[in-house]
Amino acid sequence: MSIIPSFFTSKRSNIFDPFSLDTWDPFQGIISTEPARETAAIVNARIDWKETPEAHVLKADLPGMKKEEVKVEVEDGRVLQISGERCREQEEKDDTWHRVERSSGKFIRRFRLPENAKMDEVKAMMENGVLTVVVPKEEEEKKPMVKAIDISG
């Protein structure tokens, strides 16, 4: 039975909270997390990185972004940088906005790739809001098998 949840959500909705059905909330509107939620999706771009036998593959969910709004760069020889920016739509002075829920803002993520990554062969593609970056790996040198020879004598 805490009032703290009202700081983080716009309405209490716990059926076990006897005050959840109260229509008056003295804290409503004092602290708003809307600006944080507004840009959270873009600022905290989530990226998966997996290593296959042939390559390092990074996938980023960037819903609603165009490939022109995203950059993939190599810095300092081994650092892969993925960045982007989504701008708000231009407002016409006669427009009346009822809700603005789509996020806008910038993001930047950097990944230091291991020595076996071929940084000069990085490829990136964007399809259906998912950016896929493929960094091929250098082939591991096959070490000759060492066979021990018994010494007689």
Curated annotation (Swiss-Prot):
The keyword Heme does not apply. It is found in: Cytoplasm. Gene3D superfamilies: 2.60.40.790. Pfam families: HSP20 (PF00011). One of its GO terms (cellular component) is cytoplasm. Its main location: cytoplasm. Keywords: Cytoplasm, Stress response. InterPro entries: A-crystallin/Hsp20_dom, HSP20-like_chaperone, Small_HSP. Residues 38-153 form the sHSP domain. Belongs to the small heat shock protein (HSP20) family. Forms oligomeric structures. This is 17.6 kDa class I heat shock protein. It comes from Helianthus annuus (Common sunflower).
